[in-house]
Amino acid sequence: MATLQRSKQAPNVEEVAEVEAAFDRREKLIDGKVVSKTITDELKAKVEDMRADHDCVPGLAVVLVGERPDSAQYVRMKKEKVAEIGFHSVDLNLPDTISQEELIAEVKKLNADPMIHGILVQLPLPEGIDTNEVLKAIAVEKDADGFHALNVGNMWLSGGDPPLAVACTPAGCIELLQRYDITVSGKNCVVLGRSNIVGMPICALLQSMNGTVTCCHSRTKDTAEKVRVTGGG
């Protein structure tokens, strides 16, 4: 009976506040598929507006060198999404025997094509081809992947011109945070990996959002502890 009487008492205000705060700090399940569907629908509508207002649609060229199964699958996924949204697309499949000079010449042809607004060179490229030289050959305004040196540099500059494009995986991570109203400013952020394609761009983007960023890599000590400090494990 004493227990029943206590349960009828008004709850302690401080205890309620503590419980509510803990509830607010709970992990959020981020559903990327739902966000992807939303973004796809938004892009479809924008493409239809472009078609109606300007009689044109965005054009994307994808350059695939060689026959790596993983690269081919990734390109197929991109083609399916491009077709779903309504883009104009061009696929350039080149043999892995192509020289660096020949590949750059093909990229420059796409630079000059007015129907192409974005160029994506699928990585990795075969041995013997300097990836940086090929990426620099892409016109910066057509750099769909955000790998051009000017776009990378602008991403790291504070207060400068924003990059015209950002690498897709880092951009997707930030988009998910924003769509779920997750604030980065003032928070400790741990990034696992320092690749030019994912890890380093995410570090730059999180820093630009005023996060305090720790980048862990193969030489980092106590990585698990650094992750636990952020509440991620």
What kind of region is each of these model predictions?
Residues 2-54:
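Positively charged, low-complexity intrinsically disordered leader regions
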Residues 2-5, 84-86, 109-112, 138-141, ...:
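Non-catalytic terminal and connector segments of soluble metabolic enzymes
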Residues 30, 118-188:
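Anion-binding alpha/beta catalytic cores of soluble intermediary-metabolism enzymes, centered on
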Residues 57-66:
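Short beta-strand segments enriched in small/hydrophobic residues
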Residues 60, 82-96, 213-216:
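Short beta-strand elements in bilobed, periplasmic/extracellular small-molecule ligand-binding domains
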Residues 65-79, 161-233:
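Glycine-rich phosphate/diphosphate-binding loop of Rossmann-like nucleotide-binding domains
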Residues 72-79, 105-107, 132-133:
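Glycine-rich loop at the start of a catalytic domain that most often binds anionic cofactors/ligands
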Residues 102-114:
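Short, well-structured alpha-helical segments in soluble
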